[in-house]
């Protein structure tokens, strides 16, 4: 049986460690798409920091876990954000806890057929149940490499690609280098060869962008950094070129995750 979320591209920006800008990239890419009239659902799956909710200055009183347990419509847990065309769904529990629910709950996401994109913001690790589930539910994922911690970040990206592509049947759509300095073309080409992916965007280290999380500011909408805006536009162009995935065997993927974690 097909459990896919109708007429949506489901995407995760993945990264191996926290504090490297994954949430900022997710929110700004969503804002850029929303500005073009696309409808976006952001799933804040990071229970610990609630990063997307913080950045967008949104507070949820009803969570996905609540509506599943109480058998309420999923839309009851979705809240508006200050940005037109962007809505947010907070999970309320660790993503790992959702593996204990009946797989048939995924059918209820058919209610959400009016979005163009779903972005899942999961905890920042290259392994673990939360990462596996976010990748498993995503049609595509984009590894984000932190240039200021390049060695661990590159290894994390390699791990994520191996698991996401070969085990969880999600497709890597390219990679992003974040907090970069000026990079020789030879270095970028080496990374392409190692990961087997194209480079979508190189976002240079910028204190204005890094401080935007604390300030709860979406830099793309303020146009306060033209280079950053240009790089987000490159990401959006790549996302718009991705083909819609017609069918995925999500129950099979979920079972793989359960088996690997002994749940």
Curated annotation (Swiss-Prot):
GO cellular component: cytoplasmic side of plasma membrane; cytosol
Nucleotide-binding recorded as keyword: yes
A GO molecular-function annotation: ATP binding
Binding site for ATP: 16-23
SUPFAM superfamilies according to UniProt: P-loop containing nucleoside triphosphate hydrolases
Keyword annotations: ATP-binding, Nucleotide-binding
PANTHER family in the cross-refs: ATPASE INVOLVED IN CHROMOSOME PARTITIONING, PARA_MIND FAMILY, SEPTUM SITE-DETERMINING PROTEIN MIND HOMOLOG, CHLOROPLASTIC-RELATED
Family indicated by similarity: To M.jannaschii MJ0547 and MJ0169.
Record's protein name: Uncharacterized ATP-binding protein MJ0924
Species this chain originates from: Methanocaldococcus jannaschii (strain ATCC 43067 / DSM 2661 / JAL-1 / JCM 10045 / NBRC 100440)
